[in-house]
Amino acid sequence: MHCPVIELAQQLIRRPSLSPDDAGCQAILIARLQALGFTIETMNIGDTLNFWAWRGKGETLAFAGHTDVVPTGDVTRWNNPPFEPTIRDGMLYGRGAADMKGSLAAMVVAAERFVANYPQHEGRLAFLITSDEEASATNGTVKVVEALMARHERLDYCLVGEPSSTEVVGDVAKNGRRGSITANLTIHGVQGHVAYPHLADNPVHRAMPALNELVATEWDKGNEFFPPTSMQIANVQAGTGSNNVIPGDCFVQFNFRFSTELTDVMIQQKVQALLERHQLRYSIEWKLSGQPFLTSRGKLVDAVVNAVEHYNEIRPQLLTTGGTSDGRFIARMGAQVVELGPVNATIHKVDECVKAADLQLLSRMYQRIMEQLVA
């Protein structure tokens, strides 16, 4: 069976684009978009490839995505080589099938069909594509957004193709995401011999009451759109490896996934007040990965709901759960941002796969969103 969405997805999967290596994926997408009359602007930074493409003028709907994928893990555990796309029992297998080369294929084919039907469409259709989402996300979408904002580029709506669905395509759309901030905390003590604790100051012992309080704290209660803020300790390191040395320092790394009830500044202030209360000698560094964002009901959310209902006869849940995505950068432009993509059950796993029929459905949903917003 000839299906342009599946064929393009297979083309992309064949390219081992381990983040941030694009491995030629964007050249394929650019060629398809240029054939439709899109203007292409590449914005390559270091080892990261990015492009911004647009067609038409006026109110702007952008489709955003990434060509990079995560490592495969042990390839011997895959039923088929991860970069040799295979269809078996109606499922398309391969690294990136769900996250997110399937979405990219669905977007581009949707654009081809849309332009064929509306060659003189009224609004502007755009694409923002990067090869740096899965790894550091430092030279990708965030840098493109900064460049677009610097020149006051218009962006009204953005559909991110992240795999948002859980059971069937379109059952969940993400209309926001929690913020993420990480603390790298070092508690300072005095190294010494375990037999002479009075001559040392054990930073692990010092840290434990403070860490207990951190874990027990209710940071907020969440709200209508977001679950309560969560704090998780990710790494703890101390000691020399010897059983007779009291360590001099204790390193603790912890991360907050926070709702719109808090800001990153409020979190930092609360943590530092807690550490001061416990009279610790410490140093702390913070890394903000993204602020929370929320897209309320409006034209984009309504268009997404309409498209899903039309093609899959279900009403999508609007959720803000999960990790961060590049939507956090795009939201800075004041755009309405929604994520809609395939089922995420196998993303980052061995034998990543997606229903071939889901990608065909997804492409039709994307096309209908285009028709509602920029036709």
UniProtKB/Swiss-Prot annotation:
It is an enzyme of class 3 (hydrolase). Its cofactor is Zn(2+); Co(2+). Zn(2+) 1 binds at residues 66, 99, 162. It comes from the Bacteria. It catalyses: N-succinyl-(2S,6S)-2,6-diaminopimelate + H2O = (2S,6S)-2,6-diaminopimelate + succinate. GO terms for biological process: diaminopimelate biosynthetic process; L-arginine biosynthetic process; lysine biosynthetic process via diaminopimelate. Pathway: Amino-acid biosynthesis; L-lysine biosynthesis via DAP pathway; LL-2,6-diaminopimelate from (S)-tetrahydrodipicolinate (succinylase route): step 3/3. Its EC number is 3.5.1.18. Zn(2+) 2 binds at residues 99, 134, 348. It holds the Pfam family M20_dimer. The active site is at residues 68, 133. One of its GO terms (molecular function) is succinyl-diaminopimelate desuccinylase activity. Keywords: Amino-acid biosynthesis, Cobalt, Diaminopimelate biosynthesis, Hydrolase, Lysine biosynthesis, Metal-binding, Zinc. HAMAP family: DapE (MF_01690). Homodimer. Catalyzes the hydrolysis of N-succinyl-L,L-diaminopimelic acid (SDAP), forming succinate and LL-2,6-diaminopimelate (DAP), an intermediate involved in the bacterial biosynthesis of lysine and meso-diaminopimelic acid, an essential component of bacterial cell walls. This is Succinyl-diaminopimelate desuccinylase. It comes from Erwinia tasmaniensis (strain DSM 17950 / CFBP 7177 / CIP 109463 / NCPPB 4357 / Et1/99). The lineage of its organism: Bacteria, Pseudomonadati, Pseudomonadota, Gammaproteobacteria, Enterobacterales. The gene is dapE.
